[in-house]
Every structure is written in structure tokens, then in C-alpha cells.
Amino acid sequence: MPADHIPALALAGPTASGKTAAAFAIADALAPRLPVEIISVDSALVYRGMDIGTAKPTPAEQARVPHHLIDIRDPLQAYSAAEFVQDATRLIGEIRARGALPLLVGGTMLYFKALFDGIDDMPPADAAVRARLEAQAAAIGWSGMHAELARVDPPTAARLAPGDSQRIQRALEVWHVSGRPLSSFHTTKTVAASDRPMSAASLFSLEPHDRAWLHGRIAERFHAMLAAGFLDEVLRLRARGDLHAELPSMRCVGYRQAWESLDGLYPMSSLPERGIAATRQLAKRQITWLRSMPQRHSIACDAPDATAQLVQAVRARVWGGSA
């Protein structure tokens, strides 16, 4: 049975840090006494048909240890941090009721932040408003949309780059739906600390001491994805006819760069370089977020015994001296 003092554990890290393999190592180490079920904390893995570019666990891997929040949305749909918190909270309760330990694994730091800190009481996504904003962006560009955001919500515009289309769109959507700037929602949370499903004290992280090590793995993985048919995967998604470049699913790292190349905005020969560069930038943001969480238990993922260190730390957290 899971320890009462630990409702769940979390494993975070930048892309290509080895989270999937580490999660299986944790599950194997605890299995003799405590079964584990994995809750994905990844905004790309929620989408069906996006397998290669997301490094989605294979069906065999998902059968080996139960996985949740994978393949739960069509790429045409959105999936918000608020929906994630609702789903993850429900799953944590259900998994514990089965006598297992929930292990939340991923790199979408916005989801972890919402889970640990509570979520701002913002309005839900509005498809009609988003469609109008996308049409406006097609006419004036995202730099023009950024200027519009600066008019209605200067603090949010100041922290967003003019090319950050996804966040600019969301900020303008909040303004149009609620009549309030996004920045005004950042002072209150809807969930009290005592009611949150878990805290950052149960967060383990994989972080490289040598950034070059991670950069090498990112490059190796992107080239492997291309060799595995990633571009064909994007072509199949485009062939549906109902997807476009501004959807959250198609803004995922790798997919966005592939879509741009297929649109002729960049030479196809530049796709590996641009995809790797975008993935490195994502990893940099992920590491920055992790380092802002002083309660985390950090493991150097580039250490030769990283997996052994992680398993030992997890066992100590779960069972203390009885590990």
C-alpha cells in the first residue's frame, strides 16, 4: 500500500534527460512492495497521432506500467493546465484507491506549477474567440497582435516576445472573454494549499551538470525521430485538412518547425538545425523553471549512476529507513 504521507511522486526534467527510462526504473524498484501507475505531465503526449515527434512511450511500454493522460485529445482540440489539474487530481485518488502509487512524469512545467501552486481563476478556452483572434493574426501578424496586447494588458505584453503566438493569443482570449487583463488573474489561486493533491516536496528532477551532454542527446534524438519517419507523421496530420499551424498541437516543438518547412517558409534542409535549436531552447526554459523549485530533489542525469541515485532517493522518500 502507498505510504500515507506521500499521496504521489513527481519526476520532471528537460526533454531528452531520460525521464521515461528513469520512470520505469522507479516502477521496477518499487514493484515488489508497491505497484506504480504513471500519469503523464506532457502537453504533447495528450494528442493522438503524434507519436514519433513526441517520443511517446510505445504500446508495449504503456502495457508494462499503466499510463494515464496519453492519447486523450485529438490534435484539433486544446487541453489546458486547468483540465490537467482536474484530471491529475482525479487520477491520483483513483490510483491510490487501487493501492498503487501515482508517479507523475513529464516536462510540461506549466502543468507542474499548476499542480503544486494552484491555478489562476481564469476563464476557460473559447473556440469562437480563438478563431477570431487567429483570423486577426492572419491579417496583421503576431507582432500586430502583440501591439494590441500591449494596449489592453501592458504587464503581460512586456514579458512576452512578439513571436510568442500561443501565449499572446491566450492573453487576448482572456481579455475578450472576461474583460480583464491576464495579469490581473495572477494574484489569486482557486485551490487552497491544503487541498492541492501534492506538493513540490515530492518532486524529483533530472538535471544535467554539463549542458553539452544534454545538447548532444537532443541532437541525437531529433535525428533519430527524422529517421523513424517524423516528417511522414507530420504529412499525415496535414493531409487531414482540418489542422493548421496555429493550433496548440501543431505548435509543439518539432512539429512547428516541420510544418513551417512544409509550408515553404524555410528550406527543408534546415529542419534538423531548427528543430534541434528549438528543442534546446525548450530544455533551457525547463531547467530554469526547475531551478526555481528549491524543494525539489535534484539528480544529475549525466552522472554514470544517475538511475541508481534516483531509485535510492525515491525508496528513501517512500519508505524512509525501511528502504
Swiss-Prot record:
HAMAP family: IPP_trans
Species of the source: Acidovorax sp. (strain JS42)
Entry protein name: tRNA dimethylallyltransferase
Binding residues annotated for substrate, in chain numbering: T15, A16, S17, G18, K19, T20
Gene for this chain: miaA
The protein's role, per its UniProt record: Catalyzes the transfer of a dimethylallyl group onto the adenine at position 37 in tRNAs that read codons beginning with uridine, leading to the formation of N6-(dimethylallyl)adenosine (i(6)A).
UniProt-listed Pfam families: IPPT
NCBIfam families: miaA
Cofactor(s) this protein cannot do without: Mg(2+)
InterPro entries: Dimethylallyltransferase (IPR039657), IPT (IPR018022), P-loop_NTPase (IPR027417)
Residues given in the record as ATP binding sites: G13, P14, T15, A16, S17, G18, K19, T20
